[in-house]
Amino acid sequence: MCRIAGAPRTLLPLLAALLQASVEASGEIALCKTGFPEDVYSAVLSKDVHEGQPLLSVKFSNCNGKRKVQYESSEPADFKVDEDGMVYAVRSFPLSSEHSKFLIYAQDKETQEKWQVAVKLSLKPTLTEESVKESPEIEEIVFPRQLTKHNGYLQRQKRDWVIPPINLPENSRGPFPQELVRIRSDRDKNLSLRYSVTGPGADQPPTGIFIINPISGQLSVTKPLDRELIARFHLRAHAVDINGNQVENPIDIVINVIDMNDNRPEFLHQVWNGTVPEGSKPGTYVMTVTAIDADDPNALNGMLRYRILSQAPSTPSPNMFTINNETGDIITVAAGLDREKVQQYTLIIQATDMEGNPTYGLSNTATAIITVTDVNDNPPEFTAMTFYGEVPENRVDVIVANLTVTDKDQPHTQAWNAVYRISGGDPAGRFAIQTDPNSNDGLVTVVKPIDFETNRMFVLTVAAENQVPLAKGIQHPPQSTATVSVTVIDVNENPYFAPNPKIIRQEEGLHSGTMLTTFTAQDPDRYMQQNIRYTKLSDPANWLKIDPVNGQITTIAVLDRESPNVKNNIYNATFLASDNGIPPMSGTGTLQIYLLDINDNAPQVLPQEAETCETPDPNSINITALDYDIDPNAGPFAFDLPLSPGTIKRNWTITRLNGDFAQLNLKIKFLEAGIYEVPIIITDSGNPPKSNISILRVKVCQCDSNGDCTDVDRIVGAGLGTGAIIAILLCIIILLILVLMFVVWMKRRDKERQAKQLLIDPEDDVRDNILKYDEEGGGEEDQDYDLSQLQQPDTVEPDAIKPVGIRRLDERPIHAEPQYPVRSAAPHPGDIGDFINEGLKAADNDPTAPPYDSLLVFDYEGSGSTAGSLSSLNSSSSGGEQDYDYLNDWGPRFKKLAEMYGGGDD
């Protein structure tokens, strides 16, 4: 318990005892006590008090939570108390001693029980020289005394009193350090004590906020406090002697930081967005805006109130919305929200603390944007009462008409999108309406073909709706219904055959020129005078013809049921009907002729080839009949052997097994192996019956004990078919032709090779390749050549090695002669003679050829030549006057000359 200095000191021991009891009984649970928790509430105010100014707040402890109390002031003319305990000034007045104290009563409304508490108002001191000099009145806290034992037990007092907390306003301007309270022990009379405080704000972070004079025990604050940072400090005071021994138990000191209105409200968002459906009733919730205040929310400084400062636009009413001043809920208060007129509202919201007091409260603003959402309150309306369109007959998926509507709702929403339906005039469902998603128009489309000859015009009744129902209370106007007049345009249609296909039944075998039926087509265009002509489109067997005018179908060939063009007894022919309209149209029809069978096919033996043994046992031949007719013109069949030739019945016998099968056996004991043609008479069951002699080729062979043929090769050779023989002969002829062509080609190639040999350059041919020397002169007169040597140059034996002697400088060196490939035999000697004569003739007639036959003048080459002077050479002179034996030394190429001019008798 705190007291003012100068109060009766007799209360100090009691306070100390109570404090000691509270410290020792800290583990006990304090009992709740209904009433005011404080004995005195105090507030420090300025000199001038204004009307409506909040002064302080009192708290009432309602333990059971069920009491409803009502506050009253002992000075109702000056002060009033709100339901939450906030004390306001009723009028403006200067603070004086007569207003410094008054009482506040709390009365239970049900039990009428009453409680009271004192309120003390203090004037905020002004720093003058006198006030500085005067010692302020400082509260004093005394350590409780040590309790003595009574009857051997430590006495403990009830905890009816506790040390009240120290209330210190935030943002104090000082001067600092500012004294708060003095802590003292009763033992300071006998002992020299030292005081200290511990805890956050003293020796713990934030350190240095509170300090204590260790000798006097004066507790002071060193700087302004901020409640928004730390709202309460919990310190412990200690008292020790000069030796550091504890002389008092520590006491707790609680310092409450009194909130000051130093923070404005702050909205969580500067711009708030909300929506409300158009046409909403008053009282419809829209949105909630929220602001926070850093000041004490339990005090006036943190109690906010909201209000709407402005609304834009102000139509249809300037007060379309209101706001709950405590919760910030925005609701509608007026009707008439219409999105088609106003799509968005902008509200300026203000939040003010001090419970919205405009004089002392701090305020802030934010913007609330409310969008009016669309509802389906505008039905679609047609732009015209009647729409017109036309469509050619037999056309589908054609847009007939384009329906246009207007809808004031928000485009491309379910409340704007139109849905069209046909409510009348189309019982067969020939039309449908689709919605264009971009323009919202209705596209009337034909979904079923329309026949002009049946319906020439349609009058449709159409209605337009939205994808969602209309808002409550909205009705569809007459403009939501319209009519569509559709005109059908006549077009030239295809002629059609009826029935199609047309089926007729006729016997096969009808002769050419028989009229089968009339196959005509109908023209659906009854109102057009048109002619139809007929043509044949498909007739696989070319049996039919159709009259181009009347459509009569006549045969031009015999109808045959057994034809490959007949499937399942039905012959199909297709015909074309064309009109002369603009444009001309055509249609096809199919005629199906079901051909009835007649007995026009004789039966044949099956199989046509068989084999059996030379003796009747152990096998026989099973045969049946093949008849292209069907019942009853086919089986059962009758099998028999002809009377002629007589060998047939003498050698063979036939036995009927049933209506379809018979058995052929040898009648004699032995028949030589070979191939036999056995005629068999087969008769069907038609009316009249039809017979046929069919040949069965039977191969008779030697058989083993099992009845199997053993001379298969001979039978196979004897039984070779005509086609196989022809194929073999053709192959042989082709091979002979190929061999002959190859021989001719080889001979022609040899001739070409021989001709090329004759055209070879003389310098390249070994047979006449005479070496060139420095002896120059005319041609040789003697042209009596030995052609046999030219024809067979390879027969000439190589000459022996030339003996050592004088050699010409132009003589070929002696070395191994090159081996030339052996040429083919030379052609006829006459060919070579002709070739040489042609060469000579060409050389004589060529003016650019070397003058081999002309007189040439040569320089003298000096002596030493065995030939002497060139002028002495005369090829026409007698050879006997000269010695040509040296030619034998010139090698094999001059051997012939040596033989001709050498020392022989020739």
UniProtKB/Swiss-Prot annotation:
Q: Which residues are glycosylated?
A: N190, N273, N325, N402, N572, N622, N651, N692
Biased composition of type Low complexity is found at 863-880
> What remark about domains does the record contain?
Three calcium ions are usually bound at the interface of each cadherin domain and rigidify the connections, imparting a strong curvature to the full-length ectodomain. Calcium-binding sites are occupied sequentially in the order of site 3, then site 2 and site 1.
- Where, by residue number, does Ca(2+) 3 bind? N261, N263, D293, N301, D353
Q: Which residues lie on this side of the membrane: Cytoplasmic?
A: 746-906
Entry protein name: Cadherin-2
Classify the protein's membrane topology as the record does.
Single-pass type I membrane protein
What processes does the entry annotate via GO biological process terms?
A: adherens junction organization; calcium-dependent cell-cell adhesion via plasma membrane cell adhesion molecules; cell migration; cell morphogenesis; cell-cell adhesion; cell-cell adhesion mediated by cadherin; cell-cell junction assembly; glial cell differentiation
Q: Where is the Cadherin domain?
A: 160-267, 268-382, 383-497, 498-603, 604-714
Gene3D superfamilies cross-referenced by the UniProt entry: Cadherins, TCF3-CBD (Catenin binding domain)
One GO cellular component assignment for this chain's record is: catenin complex
Residue ranges, Extracellular side = 160-724
User: Which compartment or compartments is the protein found in?
Assistant: Cell membrane; Cell membrane, Sarcolemma; Cell junction; Cell surface
Q: Region entry Disordered: which residue ranges?
A: 863-884
Give the propeptide segment as residue ranges. 26-159
**GO molecular function ontology, one term from the record:** cadherin binding
Tell me the function of this protein. Answer: Calcium-dependent cell adhesion protein; preferentially mediates homotypic cell-cell adhesion by dimerization with a CDH2 chain from another cell. Cadherins may thus contribute to the sorting of heterogeneous cell types. Acts as a regulator of neural stem cells quiescence by mediating anchorage of neural stem cells to ependymocytes in the adult subependymal zone: upon cleavage by MMP24, CDH2-mediated anchorage is affected, leading to modulate neural stem cell quiescence.
Q: Which PROSITE patterns match?
A: CADHERIN_1, CADHERIN_2
Keyword terms = Calcium, Cell adhesion, Cell junction, Cell membrane, Cleavage on pair of basic residues, Glycoprotein, Membrane, Metal-binding, Phosphoprotein, Repeat, Signal, Transmembrane, Transmembrane helix
Q: Where does Ca(2+) 1 bind?
A: E170, D226, E228, D262
